[in-house]
Amino acid sequence: MALDILVVDDEEDIRDLVAGVLDDEGYQTRTAAHADEALEALAARRPSLVLLDVWLQGSRLDGLELLDEIKKRDPSIPVLMISGHGNIDTAVAAIRKGATDFIEKPFEADRLLHLVARATETERLRR
């Protein structure tokens, strides 16, 4: 069974691009445009990984706040933060809040796939 990855980004083109890359590699993806949609998806089914944009414009919660909420609900879910506006302080804050890793946009598909594989290693070993 394919690992389930939830992609949370306010930019539809980024969601579609990331989901497409992951689908092509055999992952099962779901997408969410904002925090409430992401929380509904989490409640419906636990993902193997969440790819989460830091800013989430127009959302009730930004990415770091949503990261807090995800970790409150299930600390074992790995979360890979994505940002086009990130800096070292944002990356450090995300890691301190429990993110597995941090990747800046734009990124190469190979780099994304490497980080996804690393973040889901424990989940794969459980199967």
Predicted regions and their residues:
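Short amphipathic alpha-helix used as the core "switch/output" element in two-component signaling
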Residues: E40, D62-S76, A93
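His-Asp phosphorelay/catalytic-motif detector in bacterial-type signaling
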Residues: A2, R46-S48, K72-P78
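Two-component/phosphorelay signaling modules centered on CheY-like receiver
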Residues: L3, E11-R30
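Active-site residues of response regulator receiver
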Residues: D9, D53-W55
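C-terminal output helix
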Residues: N87-D89, I103, F107-V116
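Acidic, metal-coordinating helix/loop segments flanking the phosphotransfer/catalytic sites
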Residues: L6, T31-L49
